[in-house]
């Protein structure tokens, strides 16, 4: 495989486009390819129905088929999937006219065209305080016996990260199957693998993208010594829960992830008996009753399954989140303290530090002519080094300064420079990305630098008639005290779907993460790994950590595990100062949520905020959803007129999001003691300007494990002190000895 093809494989994953995707069959899920009729006017619709009364699971397909218009029954069967666990309904190929006719059936709640959603480590375990044979890894048996279900692009089963040496057989509850054939496929590590995006050329759940292999090994990869990419980030690659089992559900391909396949994967995973679901994918914000991941996740938590999802890569814009439902752990991305360092050195002696994975040893450090790509390009896209935008006469043999953005993938910019004869590339961040360069596997000598450094390079180019530069490659450096830092791409809150719930919930490692890859990037014979970035990478870190907690505390609910993760999170970096964002200023709660995950502390949180599935009913009715819309989520008939509605902030969540106008708001929370039997917690509050807070009681005294106590907190507006600010943030901590149970608070001023 050529280097260009390899890089295309990588970028097709990261910048996946939203276009149509084929569906696939599964056990207990019906699938028919429509080969004998014109499909040009057919689209896949997701159909939600009222919960059938007293009907056997095996009869569901027949029941759903009976609802279809007669015009669909004259040719091949149109039903793509039938769902049994996470939603009441099915996916079907219809014309717009047939969909309209179907919606006239009183058993049908809704029928809408499906959307296509997009895909959103040698060092991270030690960065997070996980050590072999010690602490949480020892106490949780490294996740032994826990099953992590991963919905992604498939998996490469031959990779040593998925060796089952020394692993036990799957637990007796496991009900899944393996669709791989031949030898060395599923084993006691990969215990299940299904494909829901079958095509004529690819029917098995092999990973033809790379994303699924990377996320699976991040969550639960086995130790592999000598892991590296081009000699960088060398060490032992291991996942968060190395002894957990993996079940892969292939729901995505090169072009994205169809809603019908996602629902089919989640439906099957629940039936199979997974303990944790990990989804590094998502779509735009929308109401929960139209969100396939929110729907599937609610069905999962009803069965005690923890669900972790990526927050999306649309930052740093506010309200850019995916996967906002309160029953999902929404994970943003942060940096780690490892840098794959490269330096841009200018002819005036100044140096600007950046990052690059590709660090050729044969690149001479001598100065070369430096040119700005936007100076004499072929079109307006030359500044972004778009393909065929550069003149060979301008860039041949030179170092080319390119700008990030312009809808041109970073590695493709380097290819454009190389194709035009350029010797090297210096890539400067956009103003939004600022101080947040990313290490990429470039196709030529390159370095990614900050926006500020890029401005300095532009100024230098304009100051002399003979600007020169070179790139110094300095390898892997550990110990950046600014880590963790919120990445520029990590999506921010507040939530659009539910502004009264603070999102994201947590941040975790998502920048320059090394993990398993299906193919070698440098044609070496060593096991292939790759370094990529995204909230897709942070999500499986948290999924693996949840698996550790599930083993350590098998009686904890999904909400209790989430609470433990959130209330023990860190708000400071390795240097002991507040976590920063891409601008090198303190990150706000809409970027960090509760803070950066601390797995060791999460294993012993002291107190937890628990939520039962039925507790969400008054919350959902409080969102002013109709009875039918709430029923789609709950998979049961609901009459909100008979339910006590609650405000979003009244949900027993481990954080607060307060939409504060001119009146005082009072909310209650209940905490359960999971620490020492006899313990007293004292409240500490951090109150921002423009708000007053009062708490009752100010102390909580427990006498037994499992005991629950309730407190109330009032938020009082002081509008004259706000200085025209639109939001503020504070915190509430319950402190007892070594325990500090912290809830972040966001205030949105109305």
From Swiss-Prot:
PROSITE patterns: SUBTILASE, SUBTILASE_ASP
Alphabetical keyword list: Apoplast, Glycoprotein, Hydrolase, Protease, Secreted, Serine protease, Signal
Induction (UniProt): Rapidly induced in roots during development of arbuscular mycorrhiza (AM) upon colonization by AM fungus (e.g. Glomeromycota intraradices).
Domain named Inhibitor I9: residues: 44-120
Every PA domain range: 369-457
GO molecular function: serine-type endopeptidase activity
UniProt cross-references to Pfam families, sorted A to Z: fn3_6, Inhibitor_I9, PA, Peptidase_S8
Functional summary from the UniProt entry: Required for arbuscular mycorrhiza (AM) development during AM symbiosis with AM fungi (e.g. Glomeromycota intraradices).
PANTHER family the UniProt entry points to: PROPROTEIN CONVERTASE SUBTILISIN/KEXIN (PTHR10795)
Name this polypeptide is given: Subtilisin-like protease 3
Source organism phylogeny: Eukaryota, Viridiplantae, Streptophyta, Embryophyta, Tracheophyta
The encoding gene: SBTM3
């Amino acid at each position: 495989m050529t280097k260009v093809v390899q890089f295309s494989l990588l970028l097709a994953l990261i910048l996946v486009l939203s276009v149509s995707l084929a569906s696939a069959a599964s056990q207990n899920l019906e699938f028919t390819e429509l080969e004998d009729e014109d499909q040009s006017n057919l689209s896949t619709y997701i159909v939600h129905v009222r919960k059938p009364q007293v009907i056997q699971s095996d009869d569901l397909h027949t029941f759903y088929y009976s609802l279809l218009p007669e015009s669909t029954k004259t040719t091949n069967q149109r039903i793509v999937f039938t769902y049994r666990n996470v939603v009441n309904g099915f996916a079907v190929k219809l014309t717009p006219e047939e969909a309209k006719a179907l919606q006239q059936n009183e058993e049908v709640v809704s029928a809408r065209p499906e959307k296509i959603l997009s895909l959103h480590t040698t060092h991270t375990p030690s960065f997070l305080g996980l050590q072999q044979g010690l602490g949480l890894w020892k106490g949780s048996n490294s996740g032994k016996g826990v099953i992590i279900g991963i919905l992604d692009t498939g998996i490469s089963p031959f990779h040593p990260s998925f060796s089952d040496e020394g692993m036990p057989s799957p637990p007796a509850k496991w009900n899944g199957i393996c669709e791989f054939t031949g030898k060395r496929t599923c084993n006691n590590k990969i215990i299940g693998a299904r494909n829901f995006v079958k095509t004529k050329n690819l029917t098995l759940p092999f990973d033809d993208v790379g994303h699924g292999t990377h996320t699976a090994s991040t969550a639960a990869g086995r130790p592999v010594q000598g892991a590296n990419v081009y000699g960088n980030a060398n060490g032992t690659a291991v996942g968060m829960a190395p002894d957990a089992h993996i079940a892969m559900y292939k729901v995505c391909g090169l072009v994205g992830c169809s809603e019908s396949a996602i629902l089919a994967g989640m439906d099957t995973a629940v039936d199979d008996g997974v303990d944790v679901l990990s989804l590094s994918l998502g779509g735009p914000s929308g109401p929960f009753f139209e969100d396939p991941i929110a729907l599937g996740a609610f069905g999962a938590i009803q069965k005690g399954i923890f669900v972790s999802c990526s927050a999306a890569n649309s930052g740093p814009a506010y309200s850019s989140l995916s996967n906002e439902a309160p029953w999902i752990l929404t994970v943003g991305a942060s940096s780690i303290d490892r840098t794959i360092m490269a330096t841009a050195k200018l002819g005036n002696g100044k140096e600007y530090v950046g990052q690059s994975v590709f660090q050729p040893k044969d690149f001479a450090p001598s100065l070369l002519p430096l040119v700005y790509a936007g100076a004499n390009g072929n079109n307006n896209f030359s500044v972004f080094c778009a393909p065929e935008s550069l003149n060979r006469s301008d860039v041949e043999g030179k170092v080319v300064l390119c700008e990030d953005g312009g809808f041109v993938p970073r590695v493709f910019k380097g290819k454009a420079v190389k194709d035009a004869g350029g010797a090297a590339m210096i890539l400067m961040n956009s103003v939004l990305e600022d101080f947040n360069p990313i290490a990429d596997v470039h196709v030529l000598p390159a370095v990614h630098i900050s926006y500020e450094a890029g401005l300095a390079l532009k100024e230098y180019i304009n100051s002399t008639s003979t600007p020169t530069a070179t790139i110094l490659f300095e390898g892997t450096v550990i110990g950046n005290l600014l880590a963790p830092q919120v990445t520029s791409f990590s999506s921010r809150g507040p939530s659009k779907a539910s502004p009264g719930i603070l999102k994201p919930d947590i941040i975790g490692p998502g920048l320059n993460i090394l993990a398993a890859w299906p193919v070698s990037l440098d044609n070496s014979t060593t096991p292939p790994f790759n370094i990529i970035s995204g909230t897709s990478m942070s999500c499986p870190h948290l999924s693996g950590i949840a698996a550790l907690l599930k083993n350590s505390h098998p009686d904890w609910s999904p909400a209790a595990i989430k609470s433990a993760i959130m209330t023990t999170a860190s708000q400071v970096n390795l240097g002991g100062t507040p976590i920063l964002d891409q601008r090198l200023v303190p990150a706000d709660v809409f970027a960090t949520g509760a803070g950066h995950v601390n797995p060791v502390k999460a294993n012993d949180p002291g107190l937890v905020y628990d939520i039962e599935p039925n507790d969400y009913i008054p919350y959902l009715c409080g969102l002013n959803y109709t009875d039918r819309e709430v029923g789609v989520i709950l998979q049961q008939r609901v009459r909100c007129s008979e339910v006590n509605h609650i405000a979003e902030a009244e949900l027993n969540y481990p954080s607060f999001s307060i939409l504060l106008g001119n009146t005082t708001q009072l909310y209650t929370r209940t905490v359960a003691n999971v620490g020492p039997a006899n313990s007293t917690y004292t409240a500490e509050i951090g109150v921002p300007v423009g708000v007053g807070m009062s708490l009752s009681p100010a102390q909580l005294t427990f006498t037994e494990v499992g005991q629950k106590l309730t407190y109330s907190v009032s938020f009082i507006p002081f509008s004259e002190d706000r200085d025209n600010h639109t939001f503020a943030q504070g915190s509430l901590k319950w402190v007892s000895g070594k325990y500090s149970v912290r809830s972040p608070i966001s205030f949105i001023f109305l």
